[in-house]
Amino acid sequence: MDLGSSSDSAPDCWDQVDMEAPGSAPSGDGIAPAAMAAAEAAEAEAQRKHLSLAFSSQLNIHAKPFVPSVSAAEFVPSFLPGSAQPPAPTASSCDETCIGGAGEPEGKRMEWGAPVEPSKDGPLVSWEGSSSVVTMELSEPVVENGEVEMALEESWELKEVSEAKPEASLGDAGPPEESVKEVMEEKEEVRKSKSVSIPSGAPKKEHVNVVFIGHVDAGKSTIGGQIMFLTGMVDRRTLEKYEREAKEKNRETWYLSWALDTNQEERDKGKTVEVGRAYFETEKKHFTILDAPGHKSFVPNMIGGASQADLAVLVISARKGEFETGFEKGGQTREHAMLAKTAGVKYLIVLINKMDDPTVDWSSERYEECKEKLVPFLKKVGFSPKKDIHFMPCSGLTGANIKEQSDFCPWYTGLPFIPYLDSLPNFNRSIDGPIRLPIVDKYKDMGTVVLGKLESGSIFKGQQLVMMPNKHSVEVLGIVSDDAETDFVAPGENLKIRLKGIEEEEILPGFILCEPSNLCHSGRTFDVQIVIIEHKSIICPGYNAVLHIHTCIEEVEITALISLVDKKSGEKSKTRPRFVKQDQVCIARLRTAGTICLETFKDFPQMGRFTLRDEGKTIAIGKVLKLVPEKD
């Protein structure tokens, strides 16, 4: 910019260069340097006062500090293309001061109050121009606070609005206020839709828990993996990856089981340790697979899985030698079937697996042989052969008779496994019952999260509940059923519930979530009826064992033997026995080491049946008859 002949002198202030338009300043020829300097100083002082007045009229030095609001609508700066301008004070002043009105040609310096046309290269942001420019700049958050950088990271929705009008500039009025609100509302709706919830009007499939039980290496995990593949829960590429990895470890036939045995130790040894979980759906039902361990060392884990099940699938190996090993006294076939019945499983499907083995070759004679040996034992355990048990042949490795009828066994005319599950009658569950949620596990994740199966009642988000036996009042912050968030759950569903009001360290497996108006019973002493299943020596008062009741595991002592019960007539002996032995039924009094939650079998069967184990064996099964109040 030409400053006249005195080009060596520096300007007095940053305004001076801008305010001196070409030709407006004295040329310097014929004017005394002192007079020229005085005129420049006076003009600069006038401009400085005018600018100070403009600032003082717009800025409030006593204003409260800016506090960001996380729930406020997203800030859209006025100088971005297509953004909305702040409303003008009055309609008349807007006509005179709005940016983008009829202005002078570019390059001509205007006085304060005159409109300024923006540059064609981009939005003009300067301290000069009309008073409305100052108003616009000061009404937005100050640049030094970093608001401009935040505003540049606008959402995709607002970018689309900006890109739709590329010709918009600082002088444009921008979209009306209503359109900005619509964009904000659309954005909020998109955010809300991220939480998966089931519409109230949509029909909800019945939830069924299926536990796979049986002797070790019978093929439980392989059948579970095959079901997941056939129902589309595991894709072919994943299975091919498992097959390659299994082949590298010389475990070619184990690859299907890896869909459920995710632990590296389980994959290396080929033995399930923890209860694996998986989900699959049919046309009518939603199923949860509970893959229980078959090894005798992990029977307590199997009991925990069976306690959550609605029906059990007993997997039997038809291979010569394997069936006999599993069904003999030391095998787990007998114990698993008995424990499933004790845990409350009413329906049993017996899968005769490995029918494709060369020693079997889909032989109907071998199938009938296994069936004839199993029926008497299952009947003794308590299952009705006609109503509660269903047999079917299959091959977990090839998938034969799992989803579709197999051509290898034309002698079997029944439904394949998955269609048969879908055809089962619905379980009658009442949502009006008292809330009972036995805790299976817990962990920390943005609060305290508990896992369990809702046995009775219904739970909704925001509900106030009580954790027994500690009587902690808690609030339900969130509910997840099968990895989907929901606001309401009915009985039979496997849940993850985020709680408020209790720490993770204050919860143990076996605790019960109840409603405040209907708490479950708790105590240490109770009378029971037990059946001695297997014990070499006699059992006397003072005998200690491990009690498994719903999801609770607690040390227990038999403090007294009250009477013997005749198996056939059900009559009780009039005298107290001094001991009981194998195959006898008795009424006894038990006392646990700590307080536990329980109910009588008559009032709530699922929380009133139990198992006694000792030295890795199931000693007895029984039911709770009466709760004995503690003496003060």
Swiss-Prot record:
Residues 270-274 are annotated as: G2. Residues 178-192 have a biased composition (Basic and acidic residues). Residues 291-294 are annotated as: G3. GTP binds at D217, A218, G219, K220, S221, T222, N353, K354, M355, D356, S395, G396, L397. Residues 353-356 are annotated as: G4. Residues 205-429 form the tr-type G domain. Highly expressed in brain. Moderately expressed in spleen and lung. Weakly expressed in heart, liver and kidney. Expression during the cell-cycle progression is constant. This is Eukaryotic peptide chain release factor GTP-binding subunit ERF3B. It comes from Mus musculus (Mouse).
